[in-house]
Amino acid sequence: GTGVNSTKLHYTQGAAQLTGGDLVLIDCGAEYEMYCADVSRTYPVSGMFTPRQRDVYEIVLQVQKTLERLARPGMFLRNSEAQDASLHHIAVRMFKDAGAEGHFKHSVGHFLGLDVHDVGDYSIPLSPGDAFTLEPGLYFPEERLGVRIEDDYILTEDGLICLTESLPKEVEDIENLLTHGEEIEA
């Protein structure tokens, strides 16, 4: 969705017109040999982020990068009983510390597999071989501003393998791609 629709978790109508100054949030799934992927990216319609959009985007990106570094066997995607080991609760705290409390409206991620939102027991710690997303986001409907960055991962003994790392998500890479058509080497 674009504009205020970028603040809706799963905007499906696709009827809004893209307007310069707005963001467009794309949440897409794919399937390969019966296994699913789920990826979200947020792009500035004009090709360049406004200062406010950039600030919000960078907060979301920093949360995702922190979760990527922290994710390891024994952590949880979400678990209210083990908040210090819960990636979701870590994201909530980081957003609160950034002054964005209450603007993160969904879980930090979900399991992937034969379904895009695959079954998984969130009360059991993550273990090597688990496939899941990390998708922090912030949503400000009053500003027509929604940002979500979602990537797919496999957990190993040593941390994460990002299956979607070739998709640009750094601000400079996105702006170069949109304004100059420059592809970035992954």
Describe the predicted segments one by one.
Residues 1-186:
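Active-site neighborhoods and metal-handling regions in enzymes and metal-associated proteins
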